[in-house]
Each structure stands twice: as structure tokens, then as C-alpha cells.
Amino acid sequence: MSKFLLNRCIRDLSPLTVLKDNLQQTAKPILNYYAKNAASRGIKVLFISYETLEKEAPEGIDCFLYATSWEKVKSLKELYEHISSWRTQGKQHIVMIDTINPILNTSISSFTMFFGSVLALGSICFLTSFHKDVTLENYPSYLPPCEVFLDFTSTCTVSLIGMQHLSVEHDAKMRSLPNPLLEELQDDKIISLLGSNCETAIVLHVEFRKKSGRIIKESCVLKNGKLEPYTPFEETARGPEPADNQIDFNVSFNLNVSEKERKERDKVFLPYFSAQMVGSQHKSSFVDEGTIIYHADEADDFDEEEDADEDLLI
């Protein structure tokens, strides 16, 4: 039994698996991995292309179909007829679509009918990629964002990020610096960042939705065509904070407080504490917050006949 969730999705034919890619990381290495894994299991693979040339298709596929041509774009009905005629009874099948964006841009109702009709044939599943950077002009505004829509429609979603970009983000975080990838992407002149579309090491964040609705999450690394466990970057551990009596401020005088001085300091009762106590005990009192109450001592000698401005007279 496979220990990776992605391999289980291939073995059990997860109905709809969506690979979320962008300009910084393409999903082609995962499509190649799926095709090789399916071929080793004896699963037939049909590759439907909207933007991929036949010579660039993954190795191990059984059939290649162009969904577009110079004259027209094949309708979903034509694709369904081709899939139903290609399907072999008693075999397992995977239909790969290099991008689902054109289908989502036509009609959402047609999208659901197409996938539902094909899945009803039995022993078949879909694997497709969704370009997050591509804007869908005809996507209905009353529906949730397309990525959210696919999260609830698909049974398995895979988010991709290159290991090199992940390392750069981690280094910036450890140095308390802003993410350099986001800063560079804000520049309109930069289309693709250095280290984009990595093929040697890709981090996959897999989310599988069971029939009960519960989501199972897993992270792994596709490294040189093989899946490996993913170990997150560890943050630098901070050392223990020194005690008060161990702090060295590198000054010529002593800043530490002795035990006797600390006890005498605790006995000091400042006037504004009385104002807070009076204000809390008598809410209707005239005392406002911040008012300082002063009680005269016996040593205070006030002369009512004394003129305070007498010393100012010349």
C-alpha cells in the first residue's frame, strides 16, 4: 500500500484531481509523473491538449487528442464522443487535460455536465491543471472565485511551489525581511522569477476530500521523478533569556537593585494610586481618572494671610 496520498489517488482513480499552477511553477512535471505511474499500473491514459504540442506530451500516454485547431475548438460533446469511443471495457482510464481554463471559460453548466457524463461511464477519472494567473473573462461573477469553486468540485487538489522559491522565502523570514518574490512580482517588467518552473524539486501540498466531506492533507516533494517526504524548514531556535541579575549593560555603574532596595520600593505608595481607588469605589465621585489626591501633613504650614505674589512686587 502506497504511503503517499497522491499515489493512492492514482490507484483508486480519484474522480477529479486539479493541479494549481502559475507562471512561477508549471504542473508539467506532475503530469509526467502521473503518466509514468499510470503506465506502470496498466492504466490507459488519454491526453487532451489545449496548449501542448504532441512532441511535448508526457511519456507513457496511449492517445493524444488536440482540442483546438486552426479552424475551430472542439466542443465538449465532441470530446465526450471521442472519450466514450476510446474507452475499453474492463480497463482503468485516466483523462489528462493540460489546462481546464478554456472549459471553465465557456460555461459552468456545460463543465459539470461534461465531467458528470464522462465519470458515469465508469472506471475513469480526470487529471487537469488550472492556471491561477489566467483571467477567465466569461466566468460568472455571481459564483465564488474559480479556485474556490474547484476546491469544492474536485476530489483532490494539489498546490505547487518550487523548492528554490520556498528556500528564498524561508531565508527572508529568518532575517525579518519582506518576501523578495512578492516584491519582484510587483514590477510589471518581470514576468518570471529566477528559479521558476523547477523540475528537480517541487513541493506538493495535497488536499483530498473524502465522500463524507472530511479533508485529508499531506505535503510531499517530487524530486527527480520520485515522491519523497517533505520536511519543513526549521526556524532558528532562540536561546534562553538571561535572568535579571545576569544582564550586563556594559556601563561603569551598577544598575541592579538589591533585595533591601526592592522591598523598600514596594512600600512606596504614590498619590495617584489613591485616585484610582477612590474612583473605583465611588463611581459617582468627583474624582476623574488621572487625578492626584494630596493629603496635607502636619509639617505643611500654610499662612492664609501670606500673599503669594508678594515676592514679585518691586
Swiss-Prot record:
Its main location: cytoplasm. CDD domains: Elp5. Pathway: tRNA modification; 5-methoxycarbonylmethyl-2-thiouridine-tRNA biosynthesis. One of its GO terms (cellular component) is elongator holoenzyme complex. Keywords: Cytoplasm, Nucleus, tRNA processing. One of its GO terms (biological process) is tRNA modification. It is found in: Cytoplasm; Nucleus. It comes from the Eukaryota. InterPro entries: Elp5, P-loop_NTPase. The keyword Nucleus applies. Belongs to the ELP5 family. Component of the elongator complex. Component of the elongator complex, a multiprotein complex which is required for multiple tRNA modifications, including mcm5U (5-methoxycarbonylmethyl uridine), mcm5s2U (5-methoxycarbonylmethyl-2-thiouridine), and ncm5U (5-carbamoylmethyl uridine). The elongator complex catalyzes formation of carboxymethyluridine in the wobble base at position 34 in tRNAs. This is Elongator complex protein 5. It comes from Schizosaccharomyces pombe (strain 972 / ATCC 24843).
